[in-house]
């Protein structure tokens, strides 16, 4: 039987000093011996997805205490990728994932906590906490802040639901007036919560649900809705139940590595592919798998992408569909139900709320149950009022969206496509693979051939697009933006948004060893591995080289003879210290912290985790 970790610091004569300090935090004599459960909060006033989290840790804590535990809350950092984007701030985004994972590990192990509740929400925070939970392997439950409501606007005589990306595209389009742009900007992000489309934050929160590490509704219930309070309260109660099952009954099935097993990772990736989630999820799931010592690689993702259909499309893949619509259709449990109906989910996987995923689906899939409370839960609707306050409204739809033919979630027979929403491409340009979000690619450009336009920074590519030097048929290639080369693997939302605003979204492609925001759509191929800075072939592409992309056959090639590529490689190596670096020095301040990250990071094909 495992011993409570906390007793290292709460029991024994030699821990008198530690107990004195525990008492100074408010612990009483009767508290020593109770499980100490850490609450990792990520509240910050910098990020709309986290601005409402300040008091939610104590909401969880109250339930932990009422259930017989001791709750101790701490905070970690959170970066807003949207605010950090378009300047050197984005260099810090991906590296912050490792800082978050480390900070959670440090706090848990330094204070010998018995269990963990992770209050996350946005892009790197959920992945960082997920990595930490798999390192630590103590009972853990995730509960996120939830998605924001979509913006509602009557714009140019059209009634639209909009988000951050719509504001960016509107601003870049020269035919829109200043007032029209300002109107869109004011409407795009009306409430607290993670951006309303299937961007990275919402994708990852949906995937913790698919992994079995969070409660039903975690990925889709709006941040503003009163029902989300139930998730926080239940997380507090349920973590104590998991603690007792592990420490008092020796039940290892409640541990993160038992729940997030290989079959759970396959379930999560299957969900991701079926809903056209952010390509960043590939990066983060690969990283989490490494932390949990799960054999889950790009090979498995490639295999799954060939057999999983697209059952759900959400902004930015389609207009006017947001997370609130997914929730009305049954959320992630509804999507899991449709995938299970055609044998694509392993329902023997464990969860934090039911013994198996099969049991969970019987209760929470709206197509399988007539339980009134479940149906009421998924009828939670947006309030339509601008607010930064959690649980501030309780509006409900009159009915659920149970249409599996033309509704938000479809069955396999009526899928958007029988091929998955994410694809792994291989070829002489990406020996170790690269990723494309096929759910966001127009059918007319699933195969594409064009000349490479070479840029060695995101900034130079943006300038070229805005100055109209990119033409229909071009392939914008941005290199030296990978984990090591950036460093930090910047997101390329601005180049893709500007291509879209220039009317080039369906007639151009973009290839990079950097990554893309979950808000990206179009023929945008990222995570090219190996990256330019580690000797990848992307560094050898020259202006005008023809590149051929074939998504149906999962290939990406530059049409250059092998002998010529070898000649270019020898020529590059002859540069010595200047090899595998941008031709011209970039105006970019790389701090010691970023240099340390670059020195230890691995390629995107390995999740950009550190190699130590």
Curated annotation (Swiss-Prot):
<comment type="function">
    <text>Functions in the biosynthesis of branched-chain amino acids. Catalyzes the dehydration of (2R,3R)-2,3-dihydroxy-3-methylpentanoate (2,3-dihydroxy-3-methylvalerate) into 2-oxo-3-methylpentanoate (2-oxo-3-methylvalerate) and of (2R)-2,3-dihydroxy-3-methylbutanoate (2,3-dihydroxyisovalerate) into 2-oxo-3-methylbutanoate (2-oxoisovalerate), the penultimate precursor to L-isoleucine and L-valine, respectively.</text>
</comment>
<keyword id="KW-0479">Metal-binding</keyword>
<comment type="pathway">
    <text>Amino-acid biosynthesis; L-isoleucine biosynthesis; L-isoleucine from 2-oxobutanoate: step 3/4.</text>
</comment>
<dbReference type="InterPro" id="IPR037237">
    <property type="entry name" value="IlvD/EDD_N"/>
</dbReference>
<dbReference type="Pfam" id="PF24877">
    <property type="entry name" value="ILV_EDD_C"/>
</dbReference>
<keyword id="KW-0408">Iron</keyword>
<feature type="binding site">
    <location>
        <position position="123"/>
    </location>
    <ligand>
        <name>Mg(2+)</name>
    </ligand>
</feature>
<dbReference type="GO" id="GO:0004160">
    <property type="term" value="F:dihydroxy-acid dehydratase activity"/>
</dbReference>
<feature type="binding site">
    <location>
        <position position="122"/>
    </location>
    <ligand>
        <name>[2Fe-2S] cluster</name>
    </ligand>
</feature>
<comment type="similarity">
    <text>Belongs to the IlvD/Edd family.</text>
</comment>
<keyword id="KW-0100">Branched-chain amino acid biosynthesis</keyword>
<dbReference type="GO" id="GO:0051537">
    <property type="term" value="F:2 iron, 2 sulfur cluster binding"/>
</dbReference>
<feature type="active site" description="Proton acceptor">
    <location>
        <position position="517"/>
    </location>
</feature>
<comment type="subunit">
    <text>Homodimer.</text>
</comment>
<dbReference type="InterPro" id="IPR042096">
    <property type="entry name" value="Dihydro-acid_dehy_C"/>
</dbReference>
<dbReference type="InterPro" id="IPR004404">
    <property type="entry name" value="DihydroxyA_deHydtase"/>
</dbReference>
<feature type="binding site" description="via carbamate group">
    <location>
        <position position="124"/>
    </location>
    <ligand>
        <name>Mg(2+)</name>
    </ligand>
</feature>
<dbReference type="GO" id="GO:0009097">
    <property type="term" value="P:isoleucine biosynthetic process"/>
</dbReference>
<keyword id="KW-0456">Lyase</keyword>
<feature type="binding site">
    <location>
        <position position="81"/>
    </location>
    <ligand>
        <name>Mg(2+)</name>
    </ligand>
</feature>
<comment type="pathway">
    <text>Amino-acid biosynthesis; L-valine biosynthesis; L-valine from pyruvate: step 3/4.</text>
</comment>
<keyword id="KW-0028">Amino-acid biosynthesis</keyword>
<feature type="binding site">
    <location>
        <position position="195"/>
    </location>
    <ligand>
        <name>[2Fe-2S] cluster</name>
    </ligand>
</feature>
<feature type="binding site">
    <location>
        <position position="491"/>
    </location>
    <ligand>
        <name>Mg(2+)</name>
    </ligand>
</feature>
<dbReference type="Pfam" id="PF00920">
    <property type="entry name" value="ILVD_EDD_N"/>
</dbReference>
<keyword id="KW-0411">Iron-sulfur</keyword>
<dbReference type="GO" id="GO:0000287">
    <property type="term" value="F:magnesium ion binding"/>
</dbReference>
<dbReference type="InterPro" id="IPR020558">
    <property type="entry name" value="DiOHA_6PGluconate_deHydtase_CS"/>
</dbReference>
<dbReference type="GO" id="GO:0009099">
    <property type="term" value="P:L-valine biosynthetic process"/>
</dbReference>
<keyword id="KW-0001">2Fe-2S</keyword>
<keyword id="KW-0460">Magnesium</keyword>
<dbReference type="InterPro" id="IPR000581">
    <property type="entry name" value="ILV_EDD_N"/>
</dbReference>
<feature type="modified residue" description="N6-carboxylysine">
    <location>
        <position position="124"/>
    </location>
</feature>
<protein>
    <recommendedName>
        <fullName>Dihydroxy-acid dehydratase</fullName>
        <ecNumber>4.2.1.9</ecNumber>
    </recommendedName>
</protein>
<dbReference type="InterPro" id="IPR056740">
    <property type="entry name" value="ILV_EDD_C"/>
</dbReference>
<dbReference type="GO" id="GO:0005829">
    <property type="term" value="C:cytosol"/>
</dbReference>
């Amino acid at each position: 039987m495992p011993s409570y970790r906390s007793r290292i610091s709460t029991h024994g004569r030699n821990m008198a000093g530690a107990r004195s300090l525990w008492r100074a935090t408010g612990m009483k004599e009767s508290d020593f011996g109770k499980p100490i459960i850490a609450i990792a909060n990520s509240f910050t006033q910098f990020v709309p997805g986290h601005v409402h989290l300040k008091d939610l840790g104590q909401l969880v804590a109250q339930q932990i205490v009422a259930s017989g535990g001791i709750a101790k809350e701490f905070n970690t950092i959170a970066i807003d990728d949207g605010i950090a984007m378009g300047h050197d701030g984005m260099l810090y985004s991906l590296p912050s994932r490792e800082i978050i994972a480390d900070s959670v590990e440090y706090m848990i192990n330094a204070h010998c906590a018995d269990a963990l509740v992770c209050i996350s929400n946005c892009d790197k925070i959920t992945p960082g906490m997920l990595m930490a939970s798999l390192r630590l392997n103590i009972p853990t439950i995730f509960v996120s802040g939830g998605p924001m409501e979509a913006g509602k606007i009557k714009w140019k005589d059209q009634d639209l639901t909009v988000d951050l990306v719509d504001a960016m595209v509107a601003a870049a389009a020269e035919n829109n007036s200043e007032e029209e742009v300002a109107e869109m900007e004011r409407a795009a992000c009306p409430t607290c919560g993670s951006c309303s489309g299937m961007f990275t934050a919402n994708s990852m929160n949906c995937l913790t649900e698919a992994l079995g590490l969070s409660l039903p509704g975690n990925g889709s219930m709006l941040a503003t809705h009163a029902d989300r309070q139930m998730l926080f309260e239940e997380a507090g109660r349920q973590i104590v139940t998991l603690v007792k099952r592990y420490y008092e009954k020796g039940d290892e099935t409640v541990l993160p590595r038992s729940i997030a097993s290989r079959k759970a990772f396959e379930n999560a990736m299957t969900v991701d592919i079926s809903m056209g989630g952010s390509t960043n999820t590939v990066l983060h799931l690969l990283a989490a798998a490494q932390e949990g010592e799960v054999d889950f690689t790009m090979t498995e993702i490639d295999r799954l992408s060939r057999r999983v259909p697209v059952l759900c499309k959400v902004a930015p893949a389609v207009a006017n569909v947001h997370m609130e619509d997914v929730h009305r259709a049954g959320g992630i449990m509804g999507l899991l139900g449709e995938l299970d109906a055609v044998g694509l989910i392993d329902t023997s996987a464990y969860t934090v709320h039911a013994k198996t995923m099969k049991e969970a689906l019987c209760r929470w899939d709206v197509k399988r149950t007539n339980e009134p409370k479940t149906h009421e839960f998924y009828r939670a609707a947006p309030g339509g009022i601008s607010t930064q306050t959690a649980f501030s409204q309780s509006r409900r739809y009159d009915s659920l969206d149970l249409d599996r033919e033309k509704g938000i979630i479809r069955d396999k027979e009526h899928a958007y496509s029988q091929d998955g929403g994410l694809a792994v491409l291989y070829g002489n340009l990406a020996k170790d693979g690269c990723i494309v979000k096929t759910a966001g690619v127009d059918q007319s450009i699933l195969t594409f051939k064009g000349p490479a336009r070479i840029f060695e920074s995101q900034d130079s590519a943006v300038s070229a697009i805005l100055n109209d030097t990119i033409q229909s048929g071009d392939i914008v290639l941005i290199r030296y933006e990978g984990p090591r080369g950036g460093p930090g693997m910047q997101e390329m939302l601005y180049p893709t948004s500007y291509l879209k605003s220039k009317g080039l979204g369906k007639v151009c492609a973009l290839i990079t060893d950097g990554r893309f925001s979950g808000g990206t759509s179009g023929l945008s191929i990222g995570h090219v591995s190996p990256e330019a800075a580690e000797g990848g072939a992307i560094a050898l592409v020259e202006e005008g080289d023809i590149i051929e992309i074939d998504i149906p056959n999962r290939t990406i090639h530059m049409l250059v003879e092998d002998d010529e590529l070898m000649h270019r490689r020898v020529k590059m190596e002859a540069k010595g210290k200047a090899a595998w670096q941008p031709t011209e020095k970039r105006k970019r301040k790389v701090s010691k912290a970023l240099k340390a990250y670059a020195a230890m990071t691995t390629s995107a094909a390995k999740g950009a985790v550190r190699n130590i």
